[in-house]
């Protein structure tokens, strides 16, 4: 059974052992034998990422290689990178480690959809052990240690409007786009209410940030450059066309309406957060925020696309997404009291080996 991956700051004992650390008293209790290490770790801030393949380091190639990569790789993305600084991606997790030691929880996975929990997944998603939005929310709800900060970036697979579309909808897509955006909001809202109900009963502060879908308009500028380069040199972007097997709406004929649907979805997300916040007036321990950081990031440079599939992000692409995503975390970090460094920081911060959540 698939479980979220938990990653603890590698040098967390050194960090919280410093007198100026906000967790120094917990460290002293641990050193005196009053608190076991497992309990000490639960007292660190916990940050969870809910999302789809945009939030992972996965890319598509041959079926077996993709299958192995999905099953065995984690991190190496804009949220979590397990390579010690300054190597790899300057991810959100590395930026957070400059402020505090913490526990990162990666729930995101390839192919994830914003779904109705009663829907049955197709065969491909089952063999990839895809966890849709409802499943990822469910994973958080059963955790003994509920996260302090929850980042949500999911829905990119839901804008594949041309997938299984009848010819009539392909020719006149307006009603289909409207229906898909409405259904998306209904399903997203239902899962958010589950999350909010659990967050409200915590005895500590919880911040949730919902990111809009990426800037597909600028993204396709880079994609078109990759397509031209491949037409000139077939050895480049070897699996560029493989994209169409999994994402019909990436075909040039359908892109303009994909961009439209993504904008519609982002409006629904913004309005949903505004509506949910009206019901949180008395919830002083919970902050809910919408961010357009990914929706406005400039993704038009071809080097931001992966050199194999020109679909998912390259290292440079993940760096752009990380910078954008972290920039909008300011209010959440301030709400949680994590906006100032705790203890000394060094350039050698890294993370431990990933472990499965129990």
Predicted regions and their residues:
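Short catalytic/ligand-binding loop motif for oxyanion handling, primarily in non-cytosolic enzymes
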Residues: 56-58, 113-116, 158-162, 216-222, ...
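A short helix->loop->beta-strand "cap" motif at the edges of active sites that frequently abuts
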Residues: 101, 199-206
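N-terminal secretory targeting modules
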Residues: 1-103, 332-358
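Substrate-gating cap/lid alpha-helix
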Residues: 219-289, 315
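Short, solvent-exposed beta-strand-terminating loops
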Residues: 48-64, 212-236
């Amino acid at each position: 059974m698939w479980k979220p991956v938990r990653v603890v700051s590698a040098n967390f004992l050194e960090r919280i052992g410093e007198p100026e650390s906000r967790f120094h008293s917990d460290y002293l209790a641990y050193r005196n034998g009053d608190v076991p290490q497992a309990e000490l770790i639960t007292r660190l801030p916990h940050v969870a990422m809910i999302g789809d393949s945009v939030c992972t380091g996965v890319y598509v190639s041959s079926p077996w290689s993709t299958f192995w990569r999905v099953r065995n790789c984690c991190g190496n993305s804009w949220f979590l990178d397990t390579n010690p600084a300054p190597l790899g991606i300057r991810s959100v997790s590395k930026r957070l480690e400059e402020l505090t030691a913490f526990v990162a929880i990666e729930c995101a996975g390839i192919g994830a959809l914003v779904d109705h929990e009663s829907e049955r997944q197709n065969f491909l998603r089952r063999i990839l052990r895809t966890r849709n939005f409802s499943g990822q929310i469910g994973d958080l709800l059963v955790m003994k240690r509920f996260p302090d900060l929850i980042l949500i970036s999911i829905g990119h697979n839901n804008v594949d409007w041309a997938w299984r579309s009848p010819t009539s909808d392909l020719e006149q897509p307006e009603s289909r786009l409207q229906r898909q955006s409405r259904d998306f909001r209904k399903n997203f809202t239902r899962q958010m209410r589950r999350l909010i109900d659990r967050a409200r009963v915590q005895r500590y502060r919880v911040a949730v940030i919902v990111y809009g879908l990426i800037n597909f308009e600028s993204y396709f500028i880079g994609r078109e450059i990759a397509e031209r380069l491949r037409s000139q040199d077939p050895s480049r972007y070897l699996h560029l066309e493989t994209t169409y097997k999994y994402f019909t709406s990436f075909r040039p004929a359908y892109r303009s309406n994909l961009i439209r649907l993504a904008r519609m979805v982002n409006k629904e997300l913004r309005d949903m957060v505004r509506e949910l916040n009206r019901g949180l007036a008395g919830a002083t321990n919970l902050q809910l925020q919408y961010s357009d950081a990914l929706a406005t990031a400039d993704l038009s440079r071809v080097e931001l696309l992966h050199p194999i599939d020109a679909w998912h992000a390259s290292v440079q692409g993940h760096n752009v997404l990380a910078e954008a995503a972290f920039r909008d975390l300011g209010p959440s970090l301030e709400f949680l009291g994590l906006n100032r460094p705790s203890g000394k920081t060094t350039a050698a911060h890294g993370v431990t080996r990933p472990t499965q959540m129990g």
